[in-house]
C-alpha cells in the first residue's frame, strides 16, 4: 500500500467532512472570541508540512537525532525573528503552548511550595497563574491579587501590600480578560522590593507589544511568556523571551529535558513564518486597527446602555458586565451564537456567579480585523449584539431577534474574504 498517494477525503471521509463543515462555520460567523484569530495560508502551509515527520529532541546543533540540518535552520530562523520582533536577547520557540511556557518558567526558577503572586481567575487572570484547579495552584503556595472594587483596574498598592506580606518568589503580571494596559515598570519595582522574580505573561497582548502599541515588559521582567496565536496571529503554541541569558539557560534545561520531549518542528516553522509576517509594516497597521475596532465596539455598546468593564478598552478585549441587565453570560453567549456571533461567557470581578454561568461576556476584535473589518463594521456588530442582549432581557424566547441578527450577519460577512 502506497500511503503517499492518499488524500484525506479518500482516507477518512468523517474527518474530511468535519473540517469542511468547520470551514463553513468559521467563514459564516462574526468571530469575537478574544483568544482566536485567523492565520495566513502561509502559516497553515508551514504547519501542515512534512516537517511534522522529523523528531528533533534538543536544540539546534545539539540534537539527539541525526538528519536535523533543515529543521535546525527553521528553528534558528524562528529564534532570530522572535528576538528581532521583541527586541530581546533570548528566545525559546519550543513550548507547545502558553501553559507549558509558564510551566517551564516555574520549573526553572521555583521549588514546590514556593510562593507565587498572580492575578485571581475571577479578576481576569489565567489558570496557570496560581488557580486552585491548576498545577500552579497545587504545587505552589499561590496567592492572588484582585482589582480595585470601584474602578476594576489593577490595584498596584494592593499588589505591593500582598508582596510585602507573603514575600513571593515569583510575581506574575498578565491576564486572560483585562481590557487595560499594564504598568510593567511598577510590577518590577514591587518585585525588586521583595526580592522576587518578575514574569510577564503577554499571551493576549503579544501583538500589541511587538508593534509598540503596548509598553514592552522586556525592559522590566526577568522572563516573558506568550502564546503565538491570539493577536500574534501565528500557530497555536508557546514562546519564552528574556534579556537575561543566564535565566535563558535555566529555561532551556527546564523545557527540555525537564518538561517536554521532541519539539513540534512543523509548528516551529509556522511560528517563524508568523514572526516574519509580524515584522512587516502592515502588521503594525493591523494591530492599530484591532484596537480602534475594540474602542468602537465598546463605545456603541455603552451608548446602547450596556456596562463595559473599566469604561472602555486599551487593547483588543471588551468585557460586558450584564449584572444590572439580569442576563447571565451563558444565556447571552448562547443567544449570540444562534445569531451567528461567536464569543464566550466570562466571569466579572467580585461576582459570585458560577464560572459555568457567569455574569458577563468577553468580546475580542483580532479575528474579524484579520478579515478586514473596520470601525464602521464594528459599529454594526455592536448594534447587532445590543439587539440580541435587549431580546435576552425582554423575552425568554429570543428567536425573533436571533433570526433578524443572523440575517444581518450573513449579509455583512459575505463582504469579507476568507480562505479559498
Swiss-Prot record:
Entry's localization field: Cytoplasm
GO biological process: glycine biosynthetic process from serine; tetrahydrofolate interconversion
Catalytic activity: (6R)-5,10-methylene-5,6,7,8-tetrahydrofolate + glycine + H2O = (6S)-5,6,7,8-tetrahydrofolate + L-serine
Pfam families recorded: SHMT (PF00464)
Keywords: Amino-acid biosynthesis, Cytoplasm, One-carbon metabolism, Pyridoxal phosphate, Transferase
Pathway the protein takes part in: One-carbon metabolism; tetrahydrofolate interconversion; Amino-acid biosynthesis; glycine biosynthesis; glycine from L-serine: step 1/1
Name of the protein described by the UniProt record: Serine hydroxymethyltransferase
Organism: Rickettsia canadensis (strain McKiel)
Gene that this sequence comes from: glyA
